[in-house]
Amino acid sequence: MAVLNHLEPQRVFRFFEELCAIPHGSGNTKAVSDWLVDFAKARGLRYVQDQLNNVVIFRDATPGYESAEPVILQGHMDMVCEKEPGCTKDMAVEGLDLVLEGDTVSARGTTLGGDDGIAVAMAMAILDDDSLSHPAIEAIFTVDEETGMYGAEGLDVSVLKGRRMLNMDSEDEGIFTVSCAGGARADCCLPITRSAFSAPVLEIAVTGLVGGHSGAEIDKGRANSSMLLGRVLCALEEKTDLRVISVCGGLKDNAIPTGSVALVAADAGAAQAVCAEMDAAFKKEYRVNDPAITVSFRPAETALLPLDESSSRSVVCMLTCLPNGIQAMSADMPGLVQTSLNLGILTTGDDAVHASFSVRSSVATQKQMLIQRLRCLMERLGGSVSTHGEYPGWEYMPQSPLRDLMVQVFTDQYGYAPKVEAIHAGLECGLFSAKLPGLDCVSFGPDLKEIHTFRESMSVASVQRVYAMVVEALKRMH
């Protein structure tokens, strides 16, 4: 049953709800891509769908706007799929269960995907509305932004004529983003060897963390469960003979992990004492930002052999010594994170432990330096680092007619000026700016809270205001 069908603007919320009914996590975008194509076909709109499942939909200028420069509307169709503990929904095949409470839209037990589904819905609503006035529109819907911006990277931009772009992938109403960090994914691989070891098998878990976006919320002082797990294992290694069996935590490299687990072979009494000690320490250290943090242990079973002594120590050393979090603040823009990294995914295979980092910096040489630091540390441990999904930063344009227009429209509508700022998170604007020289771009969006977590929510009133702003901006683009 429709939950949002009575909300205005009806087109925006209808398309958003239709999108939420289609599974569309990163890497699972074929169905939603085809849905967008069907939308274009039904309205006689020209479109392009590439092999990556990116979709570009074109709409001609309305009367009186034929000579105006085309405008690009841009958002990504994939979402981060995260669930609260105990949620049984299979997000690969099931749609979301939307919840409307007052002004707030959320999804029961899962991420909402307002990042960036609301951009998709707003662009579709504009393409669908014959009553609006606007220049020629080129609406770009990219795939796999959340896992490395692979859609934007692979899109053939030769089909585009526009050189001004409204990117609707920001989460704070009243803030226009005009510059962002570049980034890359760094995958650390540590080979391991297994051998028998006589000790009880135990499960040690660090859970209950808040998590969040590894760019936008890296400065919130929230703990990383995998890094804390390393601290627990290091403390246990100092008390007793320890053999790691496996370590795991996190699902996305761009999300701060909320829980991590290790299987170990060790003395149960020592493990109980260390876990109690570290639980108390973490509760004190993170009482403000992660008040529900818990360190626990219990007996466990596994068919896996433990790691040998050398491999076990290397794993503990890796989790203890690898850098994580903020590495430098910007000297140019007070309060802006310049360089950071986040250990987002930790997994163990039969013969290797893998740690995937999201590395970000607004200074390209700082980003490369941090990757090199990871590489040097891993090589000392006998491991290696590979990088992929690298994307450029988006440089600030001192002269931006589009920014000036958007600031004026916002000020006229709201009665005060918006904030214009740079962010530490990555945006596809950087890739498009590199591929379309001279591109004039502004990023904005409605209020979305706690994106990339199962607590994600979206403000209805904020969507209404932002959509009205976009419609008015298009009207003024003569």
Predicted regions and their residues:
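Zn-dependent metallopeptidase/amidohydrolase metal-coordination segment
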Residues: P9-V12, A331, Q338-D351, S358, ...
